[in-house]
Amino acid sequence: MPDPALNVAELLDLDRRHVWHPYGPMPGRQDPLVVESASGVRLRPADGSGELVDGMSSWWSAIHGYNHPVLNAAAREQLERMSHVMFGGLTHEPAVRLAKLLVDMSPEGLEHVFLADSGSVSVEVAVKMCLQYWRSLGRPGKHRLLTWRGGYHGDTWQPMSVCDPEGGMHELWSGVLPRQVFADAPPAEYEETYADHLRSMVERHAGELAAVIVEPVVQGAGGMRFHSPAYLRVLREACDAHDVLLVFDEIATGFGRTGALFAAEHAAVTPDVMCVGKALTGGYLTMAATLCTSRVAEGISRGEVPVLAHGPTFMGNPLAAAVACASIGLLLGQDWLAEVKRIETGLGEGLAPAAGLPGVRDVRVLGAIGVVQLDHAVDMRAATKAAVREGVWLRPFRDLVYTMPPYVTGDADVARIARAVCAAAREG
């Protein structure tokens, strides 16, 4: 007999005692919101307290909203064929179709696709590709990574090593993680002195650098900062001049979030390796990908160990791949850029009043991203409650109250989200 349905209090009690939440203690100290269902851009709490407009796209992934009929149909149809099959020695249409879609839509030259389980894993794979590339070429001394401060690349081992080591989410591990090379954080506008700093850092460390890895145009969970695309061209030129690979982490920025399909397009630059995730499946299932050029793939294949020794159990999962294909088709089949620009305009207008609030350091908007930065650590509980009172779900952190809404969010809901961000900044 199945267990009888649990009421909200029972769910929360079990959750508190047994379930570990992201960046949370055990046992839990705060009760999360129990969500019963979601549709469009709205979450329905199980306590009947009223729907909430989702201002977070479930950590930036649900770009089409929830319960979308096209994505639902893709999942159901694939489920009836096969939900999973191992990817070692086997292949299948959803994975092959997805790889071709990614190659066709990505910056020219990225020809090869490794399908991963999550964004962090895709960064692990990217790092492994770069290190193995130089080992295959007989240059094992090129084993370090250069990045700029203020970044975030994930919570597994190598990604943690290229997150900001001072004040970042993984400062606890600074003594045991691989020691990487850090440039200063990029300024918002182009500054030639900073460009020279980047050139100097690449040149100085070229003999030990396997790759430079950065989040292009937008630094995500490290601080939601924006920077000039021109720095990407500076890095491309410096890496080419000094024989260093270039990796772009597009996990947060990919699939239109910044007003370009991939943020690399703002600079007309192709990296040697690119990571994508989050919005890849429209927020339905966990999947990410690492793309690379033929130079990288062929270099690895010429080595003493001519294979990329990485094989997750759920690699190329057909269910996730089928939904990813449907999500990409949905994105490309509409005027996604007009929708992102519409949201950008709405957030720009709606967040402007926040600039006059006490305690607000900066307000910035790019594409479907809106950020209010405070001059103090946000009171997450107070800020979240303020947003919920406005009928909106937000997840502030550090000194930030921000939103990255689904692209299908209507004008009235964009305005509501902006009001909620302002309220959260005021209360938090």
UniProtKB/Swiss-Prot annotation:
Positions bearing the site annotation: Participates in the substrate recognition with KAPA and in a stacking interaction with the adenine ring of SAM: 23
Main location: cytoplasm
Gene Ontology terms for molecular function: adenosylmethionine-8-amino-7-oxononanoate transaminase activity; pyridoxal phosphate binding
Keyword Aminoacyl-tRNA synthetase: no
EC number: 2.6.1.62
Catalytic activity: (8S)-8-amino-7-oxononanoate + S-adenosyl-L-methionine = S-adenosyl-4-methylsulfanyl-2-oxobutanoate + (7R,8S)-7,8-diammoniononanoate
InterPro entries attached to this UniProt entry: Aminotrans_3 (IPR005814), Aminotrans_3_PPA_site (IPR049704), BioA (IPR005815), PyrdxlP-dep_Trfase (IPR015424), PyrdxlP-dep_Trfase_major (IPR015421), PyrdxlP-dep_Trfase_small (IPR015422)
SUPFAM superfamilies from the UniProt entry: PLP-dependent transferases
Compartments (UniProt record): Cytoplasm
Residue sites binding pyridoxal 5'-phosphate per the record: 119-120, 249, 312-313
Pathway noted in the entry: Cofactor biosynthesis; biotin biosynthesis; 7,8-diaminononanoate from 8-amino-7-oxononanoate (SAM route): step 1/1
List of residues binding substrate: 59, 152, 278, 311, 395
Cofactor(s), names only, from the UniProt record: pyridoxal 5'-phosphate
PROSITE patterns the record matches: AA_TRANSFER_CLASS_3
Any one annotated GO CC term: cytoplasm
N6-(pyridoxal phosphate)lysine PTM positions: 278
GO biological process: biotin biosynthetic process
Gene3D superfamilies attached to this UniProt entry: Aspartate Aminotransferase, domain 1, Type I PLP-dependent aspartate aminotransferase-like (Major domain)
Keywords linked to the UniProt accession: Aminotransferase, Biotin biosynthesis, Cytoplasm, Pyridoxal phosphate, S-adenosyl-L-methionine, Transferase
Function: Catalyzes the transfer of the alpha-amino group from S-adenosyl-L-methionine (SAM) to 7-keto-8-aminopelargonic acid (KAPA) to form 7,8-diaminopelargonic acid (DAPA). It is the only aminotransferase known to utilize SAM as an amino donor.
Family annotation (NCBIfam families): bioA, PRK05964.1
Family recorded in the similarity comment: Belongs to the class-III pyridoxal-phosphate-dependent aminotransferase family. BioA subfamily.
Record note on quaternary structure: Homodimer.
Stated name of the protein: Adenosylmethionine-8-amino-7-oxononanoate aminotransferase
Recorded name of the encoding gene: bioA
